[in-house]
């Protein structure tokens, strides 16, 4: 196959990609959920909608180390099996090189991203060697001011040198400042696997050293995971199964979620169970309703009715629905009396006794843009039909994000359908095939990270031991600051060392320019990763990790369904000088004098065998017979049956049947429509009952300078920022820029046409994006999909992120003092035509390098 450079590929495909992005910005129903082409030898083809791109995989300039030997490869030629967040794949290897990926034969909906997965080992952005920032190599921590600068040069060093430098920085930090100076509780989706998962590998090392400052919650779901334990006793309650929904639900409401897109991935790996259920729901003809400022890919596929409130105004719509049902005497008083606490307090707010404002549909119309008549009819429709509300997480990654889920729980309580087959709500139907019935598979553990220190801790702890997950910028910039958090006071420590592995905060954290300033504060930043993300470019020491194709591992199948186990078999040699995460941290442990404690004398295969055998023993205790490890490894996977009891699971059914015998883990044992505990915190941004708060930035706060509101939806072509450095992105970008979806009315007012390169600007930063004019986004709102790599460059217009990372624009403030979750869709912006030459995207190239 001929060599194809990234620039050549972009040039050749720019027109095609732009046309595709413009013509069909959400054509998921054609691409993700239908079956235009069957794949020979693929038995599930008629039931799944696999697409197998015809275009060849681009080849990068591949320079291998002398240790690479095709004779050593397990698969010089052939097929294997491994797993990624996008699913189980069978890599096809020719001449020691992956040339493609075949889907797993039991996958209901193979990912559209198989091409990008296959290309990942050869990405132009691959971290090829251990690298150290030149200024750091010369001046150490004194060089922090230039960390992350666009023209900062890097030096290739040996593994031994890189590990020595990293070990010295770690040792010095613990010796001089103690574990409270170590920000090691990284966040990110890393690679799947029970052994070479970067986060537990790093946590194990740092805990053996004495500990580190931890984090609570996730960027995905911090608000709901904090508020829902107060409301229903669990941050992520198990959902009623899809089997029950299909059988018993008369209406399904997709509120702020897009399961066709977001179920493409799984925290472990997936066989995409959700797809079969969506097909069955559509085939049955159940009416679905999508409540979202964007007409989602799911709504397109299902033919859903589309109700489109302004971003962040969903609690107002829900409150107005409650008002309407109360005013027409349609509330379920018996349910409220028996199963909830605090209806009287909430009702005072709804009817205006608390603040003098009645939460009528007319009130909500002025806020949300949804006509009052539609709010009324919607309220009565869901009251008159058994309705399952499927609420997403994007709706809580917005200012005051706790309120949407809490208000929906209140609405469902007023309807009285919680605990009934096909009724109530679920918070994870959009994630990891949530709602799939649990199999009988036992749990499989991973490399233990909660281990005791093996060296003395000589410095006293300063500050709090656990921080909110999204406090990283604030904490780095303001050591010693005291904040309110979930009823407690938290004090930021002073960080001297930041270690990040398998994650990219320069995409998932809001106000990216401010994060870049914060990353200049620590003495040392160490990053372990596969590719040159912006996070790696803001480090001092960078250690190259392997992709899942380049090592052995094992993992569960299905976070929600626990379908079974899959062997992750090495398909190719580690490329360049990359190493498996476990080997990297074992080598670091060796330099720190704690290798035996870290490895326990086990090789990678020893650990993998242990994980399986421990699960096998657990299965035996549960009456599940599993084959021995060698038999399992040879076959490559193991799937478990699902019982009828699990297939017919109804959320909160036990609680409804007997609330005294099965109380919720809340203050009252019931659903909390009012929480005395939260009220007792006296927060002005999260009261004792669900409330509508106007977002700090949104449609209601439009100004002449920034008249539009931003939404940052998930992209079907990557997972957060993963795969953005492969050719997959070219299927959804315009001249290598992230598309900006804009309503025809807003585009016309600005003289913008399809495919134009535009400047999108907020109070915090500016990005370049390619215009996609579509009526699938409401007027006054734009969409820039989340996950484009941060690529700031100096231009005549100032510093511009020329690739188009949505978080460059977003406000960095907590959702509230309760959850302190991150925002992703809170920003006022303006979109204008870019004038002059378009700056080149450079973030997928190797960084500037000094040859020594």
Residue ranges, per PLM feature:
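Acidic/polar loop patches that form or flank catalytic/metal-binding clefts of enzymes
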Residues: 214-215, 331-334, 374-376, 388-389, ...
